[in-house]
């Protein structure tokens, strides 16, 4: 595996914030079947388009080893950072960004299976199993729910190591650098940065596959995948899960959304603009605008029910005083120094101050006949 992370092959830029996790994906067997798109659709959240190659939808079954999984600021931990994983995935896209959607992620890791579903909405489930090499073959096996969902087989690697050719089916299946999930009532996207896949052709002997059969995708030959590949793996950086709905094509652009029905909005945007640091990448929208409404409707319900100040920063949603305080991060250094101090004010006091401003803003700032809050 290569240690450096290249960017020249990426179909879109990675977020300009620090990645959250480092990990290695090792000893992967990729098995693929074509599936009936209508039988696949109920398993894919609304808002995602099932991606196809020459009119065909695919699912992939991938047993492999997760190695050295750790926060980007920490070291690999024995007994926690290495474990076998077995996932079933399909291929989707949203707003032109192709990615992967997981139907299930089976892993022999209590930490991952408890943390990932709650934090990211990823469908991790604890399963016993292994991925190990015996002689010249890779052996893999998983079992969940007292053997109700099982997978077992072997992989024999054949051929030379290659990379996917442009426009090929292998490029469609392998070269994806984002994942999608549905979490807390909203569609989320996560970015994954790794070098281009190197793989070999392979053949497998599947002896059990009730894991895939459970999804009732209409696969006739459940023990005979149509395509089989093997890869020694890649080193991976993953980024925090963010709101999948975006305004515009710049994934690194943040947005401040305000109600737009009083002069306060325009004054606030003007105040920020005059004091913005050169590297700030912040746009503005009134809440009533079409693209702002699109974002608000995509937010978790606890956010979308409130007409308030929203800040979409690094794909995360903040509102009311939490949004206002974070606006300091876009400003010059002598304003940013107030950022940690503002958090010392207790939340109840901040909420009272926010409600007072919201209640009397029309008396202090006369409501204009036409919204002057600029769109940028």
Task: Give names to the regions the model predicted.
Residues 290-376:
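Thiol/selenol-based redox catalytic cores and closely related redox-interacting motifs
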């Amino acid at each position: 595996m290569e240690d450096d992370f290249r960017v020249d092959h990426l179909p879109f830029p990675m977020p300009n914030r620090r990645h959250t996790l480092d990990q290695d994906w090792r000893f992967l067997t990729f098995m693929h079947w074509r599936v009936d798109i209508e039988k696949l659709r109920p398993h894919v959240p609304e808002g995602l388009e099932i991606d196809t190659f020459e009119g065909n939808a695919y699912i992939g079954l991938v047993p492999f080893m997760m190695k050295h999984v750790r926060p980007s600021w920490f070291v690999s931990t024995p007994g926690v950072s290495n474990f076998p994983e077995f996932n079933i995935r399909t291929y989707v896209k949203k707003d032109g960004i192709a990615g992967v959607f997981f139907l299930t992620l089976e892993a022999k890791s209590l930490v991952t299976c408890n943390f990932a579903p709650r934090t990211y909405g990823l469908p991790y489930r604890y399963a016993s199993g292994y991925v190990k090499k015996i002689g010249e073959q890779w052996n893999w096996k998983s079992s969940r729910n007292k053997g109700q969902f099982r997978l077992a087989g072997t992989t024999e690697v054949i051929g030379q190591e290659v990379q996917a050719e442009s426009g090929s089916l292998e490029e469609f299946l392998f070269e994806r650098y984002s994942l999608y999930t549905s979490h807390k009532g909203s569609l989320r996207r996560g970015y994954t940065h790794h070098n281009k896949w190197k793989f070999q052709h392979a053949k497998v002997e599947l002896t059990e596959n009730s894991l895939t059969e459970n999804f009732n995708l209409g696969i006739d030959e459940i023990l005979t995948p149509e395509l089989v590949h093997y890869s020694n793996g890649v080193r991976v950086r993953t980024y925090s899960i963010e709101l999948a709905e975006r305004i515009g094509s710049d994934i690194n652009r943040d947005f401040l959304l305000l109600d737009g029905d009083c002069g306060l909005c325009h004054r606030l945007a003007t105040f920020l603009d005059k004091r913005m640091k050169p590297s700030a990448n912040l746009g503005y929208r009134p809440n009533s605008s079409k693209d702002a409404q699109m974002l608000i409707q995509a937010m978790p319900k606890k956010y979308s029910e409130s007409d308030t100040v929203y800040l979409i920063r690094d794909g995360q949603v903040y509102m009311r005083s939490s949004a206002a305080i974070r606006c300091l991060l876009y400003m010059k250094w002598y304003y940013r120094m107030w950022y940690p101090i503002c958090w010392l004010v207790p939340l109840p006091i901040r909420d009272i101050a926010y409600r007072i401003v919201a209640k009397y803003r029309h008396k202090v700032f006369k409501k204009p006949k036409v919204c002057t809050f600029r769109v940028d």
